Amino acid sequence: MDAPAYWGVAGRPVSHSITPKLFSIVGGAMGLVQAEQIFVEASGDEEFYSKVEMLEGDLWLSCTTPLKHSPHSKLGVKGPQGVNAINQLMRSKGVWKGASTDGTGFVSACRHIGVEPSGSILRIRGGGSTARSIAAAWSSEGGSIIPEKGRRELVRGPWD
């Protein structure tokens, strides 16, 4: 796997993010040549696109609020059904891809400690994009969701 020309974080605010440092640590452990770390301050698709279109080469970005909730239609990517958020964007050879990794990461961590989603019930508090991503991934692996009230209600989705 080749490292991108750039990796970092996009959204607003992003200056506090440790994501570029984490990319460097993981990239170094994988033997990837270090990419240039970037912070892309953007609140929506148009502002984001205007800032990254001038960058040459491949690009890996973690997206935070509010950018992760943008429709990303100009880039041709969309989040998983019900999640409606993308927290990872990648441009490789000029083609954009997006993913919501919170849920798959949570399921992987649960499996690592011996907890299988299939047939298990997960109580989940709130309804933000991380909660929706986890609910979608958990239910797609055969688990059930019991929503708990948080700052936001967990909307209806593929986990119902």
Placement of each model-derived feature along the sequence:
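Charged interaction patches that mediate protein-protein contacts
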Residues: 1-2, 149
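Phosphate/diphosphate ligand-binding glycine-rich loop within oxidoreductases
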Residues: 2-113
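Hydrophobic beta-strand segments of well-ordered beta-sheets in folded domains
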Residues: 5-7, 59, 120-122, 143-145, ...
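Glycine-rich adenosine-cofactor-binding loop
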Residues: 11, 98-103, 110-143, 147-149
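Short, aromatic/basic amphipathic alpha-helical patches
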Residues: 23, 75, 138-141, 157
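Short secondary-structure boundary/hinge segments and terminal tails
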Residues: 45, 128, 155-156
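Active-site rim beta-loop-alpha module in soluble metabolic enzymes
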Residues: 148-160
